């Protein structure tokens, strides 16, 4: 985000870091209600605005779409890439960056999903699976088309990358104003992501301690790290640390999913059975799962 602001507006990373740290502190000290309000306003604006811009570019360059799709498929699954190990590298890189985009399999998103008030857990599970589709298949594909339809990226040539590459690709399509649009979109996206991840951290902290002091320490650390991350010259060190950490998260969570699969299947079958019986909105009844340690108060319909 700081790189996008510096490239489009010429603002030094340190000033972006200071502003972002102040805004983050304001929100995290406001509690979950303020966090939810910020996310409700910010995320739809970011997603719809960016998708709309990408669709405009795709429509303008509709004749080049078949060639771009062919290029993607050829370079991902071609014989030359497979023999040279390129396909494996592409898959590995895709998995790593895919986790950054949607967190599927990490076990972090359920903490936020659990805040929602729903009649049945499967209902929220369906919504969560849709979010993965929107994040990766729609938004990330939009970015790929924007870059590949432009004339900024040259395969095999070392040059700009990351958000600056996307900015310059947008400029090549629709003019200089596009980099300001993307800067605003990145600001909205990154800020909402910071708030979201803070909530995950606070939620996880309660497992170990639930004191006011511990929450204040966490908030101070988050604000400080936001400043340091924004003012750092590049993201290489962040990815170097995050990649193995996400691998550990995924390993632990996937093992838990395997262990919980029988219970999850029972809950899913309960949802399907109610639909077959004509229920428009299935309701979760803990009494049907009396053998499990379920807090009945968590599923009371007031």
Which residues are covered by each model-predicted region?
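Extracellular/periplasmic helix-exit of transmembrane alpha-helices
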Residues: 53-71, 115-116, 130-163
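Hydrophobic alpha-helical transmembrane segments of multi-pass membrane proteins
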Residues: 19-26, 42, 52, 88-100, ...
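Membrane-interface alpha-helices at helix entry/exit sites of multi-pass transporters
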Residues: 17, 118-134, 211-219
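Hydrophobic alpha-helical segments of multi-pass membrane transport proteins
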Residues: 50, 57, 138, 146-147, ...
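Membrane-interface loop-to-helix entry segments
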Residues: 2-5, 11-60, 65, 69-73, ...
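Hydrophobic, membrane-embedded alpha-helices of multi-pass small-molecule transporters
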Residues: 16-21, 25-29, 57-127, 185-190, ...
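A generic transmembrane alpha-helix motif of multi-pass inner-membrane proteins
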Residues: 80, 215-269, 282-302
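Inter-helical loop and helix-membrane interface segments of multi-pass membrane transporters/permeases
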Residues: 1-18, 67-88, 154-174, 208-211, ...
């Amino acid at each position: 985000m700081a790189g996008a602001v510096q490239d489009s507006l010429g603002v030094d990373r340190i000033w972006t870091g200071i502003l972002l740290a102040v805004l983050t502190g304001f929100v995290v000290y406001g509690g979950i209600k303020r966090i939810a309000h910020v996310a409700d306003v910010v995320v739809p604006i970011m997603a719809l605005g960016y998708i709309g811009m990408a669709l405009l570019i795709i429509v303008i360059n509709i004749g080049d779409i078949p060639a771009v799709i062919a290029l993607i498929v050829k370079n991902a699954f071609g014989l030359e890439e497979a023999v040279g190990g390129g396909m494996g590298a592409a898959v590995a890189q895709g998995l790593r960056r895919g986790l950054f985009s949607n967190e599927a399999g990490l076990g972090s998103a359920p903490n936020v999903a659990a805040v929602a008030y729903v009649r049945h857990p499967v209902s929220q599970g369906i919504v969560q699976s849709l979010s993965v589709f929107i994040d990766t298949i729609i938004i990330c594909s939009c970015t790929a088309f924007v870059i590949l339809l432009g004339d900024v990226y040259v395969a095999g040539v070392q040059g700009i990358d990351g958000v600056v590459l996307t900015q310059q690709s947008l400029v090549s399509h629709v003019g200089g104003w596009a980099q300001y649009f993307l800067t605003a979109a990145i600001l909205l996206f990154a800020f909402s992501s910071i708030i979201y991840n803070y909530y995950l951290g606070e939620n996880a902290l309660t497992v170990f301690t639930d004191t006011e002091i511990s929450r204040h320490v966490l908030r101070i650390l988050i604000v400080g790290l936001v400043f340091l991350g924004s003012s750092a010259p590049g993201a290489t060190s962040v990815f170097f640390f995050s990649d193995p950490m996400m691998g550990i998260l995924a390993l632990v969570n996937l093992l838990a999913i395997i262990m919980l699969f029988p219970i999850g299947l029972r809950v899913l079958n309960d949802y399907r059975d109610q639909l077959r019986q004509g229920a428009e909105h299935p309701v979760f009844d803990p009494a049907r799962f009396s053998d499990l340690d379920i807090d009945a108060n968590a599923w009371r319909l007031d």
